[in-house]
Amino acid sequence: MTRYLISFDDGAMTFPEEELPAVAEAAHAVTREAQDAGVWVFAGGLHPVDEVSVVATDGTVTDGPESKAYMGGLTILDVPSREEALEWAARFAVACRCAQEVREVMSDPAVGN
């Protein structure tokens, strides 16, 4: 099994605010399906970028992100193939009404993954 990060950009969800409950329920339904299939590891949305802190290598802390694109939410799945990760991402894309990025998570036996 291989872990994949499925994520979307913060600005990708462009539907009207009153549709958020329906979109959230659709996303939760896909998450429950992933849990039932035994492939779900973690999922969560992220707070707005105005709450971001950046810690530099010297320990200096500044407010705000350093980039123009921001992750809005993520799901980590443990699936047997990239093809299956792409299938789950397609389901999340429909549920969330926005494109999903799929990236394989590097494994590191030294830390047990």
Where do the model's predicted regions map?
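Conserved, structured core segments of small domains
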Residues: 1-113
